[in-house]
Every structure is written in C-alpha cells, then in structure tokens.
C-alpha cells in the first residue's frame, strides 16, 4: 500500500528552483494559450530570447513570424536557438518596424514602454487586423523597476483607437490577454 505524502521536504534552494520553474512555465503558457488563434504573418513585439516566437510558429495557420527586440544579446540567442523557415528575429526598435502583417502579439511589453502609444502606431504602420496584448493585471510598479505603469483593460483599449475588444483571457488572476480586432469600415 502506498503511503500518502502529507509533507513536502524541500531545501530553500529546491523551493527557489521550483518557483523559477513555475514562473518560466507561466511565461511559456501565455504564448501557448494564444497560438491557436494566430494566422498569416505575425509580429512578436519584444520577443526576448525567441522561445515564444518559436512556440507559436508551430501553428500551421501561421505563414511566418518576425520577432523583434531591442536587445542584441536576446536576438543573438533567438537566432542561435529558435530560427526556422517560419521564424525570423530582428534587432529593431518598435518605432522603426514597418513590415506589413496580419496579427501582432505583445506579451508583457506594454507596461515596459514609456509611451505605450507606440504599439498603436506600430499596429497602424503594419496594418495588422488583430492583436493580442498581455499585461499584469495586478499592481507591479512598486516592485518591478522595469514597469513604467500599471494598466486596466479600458486604458489599453483606449490606446488602440482603431481596434475593438473581442475577448479577454485571464491567466491565474495575474495576467490578462486582450484580443483586439480592427474595426472594419462599411464604406
């Protein structure tokens, strides 16, 4: 007969490793969650080291995906580890990117931007039809020096003037993913 484990005996180091693993899995989960809705040519804004870009590129509905980031080190890592015939990684500022696409994804980026309106300008320049914007749904600026501000859904929706909210995904009550679609003109 198997004994029921009522206690978990861990060291501080083991506990820290588990916590880091959970955080890593949750970051990956955000990409895994949205990839089912992606299609055509996709832009991954602030793609970091490229794991999320690569993960979503496995969706057969995606023609190609470009991950952009301002970190040369991150882009070098992405190009060394995740480049495929569908994935391209570029060291580029959001303000300078202008390749047309169908969908834009921005996973935990908007709170890092001094001016979040540059994402709207990017959406207009690239003429995307849909966007997936994720952000922390709790206050983070008091402990994360890289976050310029905290957001609520309405504030983000107001930034994207030509888009409407069509869906909200709430992950673990700590991150929200907004699915936005461009308004279609009836003219």
Regions found by a protein language model. Name each.
Residues 1-97, 107, 117-121, 143-164, ...:
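Conserved N-terminal segment of class I S-adenosyl-L-methionine
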Residues 62-63, 127-129:
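A short helix->loop->beta-strand "cap" motif at the edges of active sites that frequently abuts
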Residues 103:
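Short, Asp-centered acidic motifs that coordinate Mg2+ and/or phosphate
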Residues 107-110, 134:
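Residues lining the SAM
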Residues 113-114, 126-128:
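Helix-to-beta-strand junctions that scaffold the AdoMet/dcAdoMet cofactor pocket
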Residues 128-136:
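Conserved beta-strand signature within the Rossmann-like core of class I S-adenosyl-L-methionine
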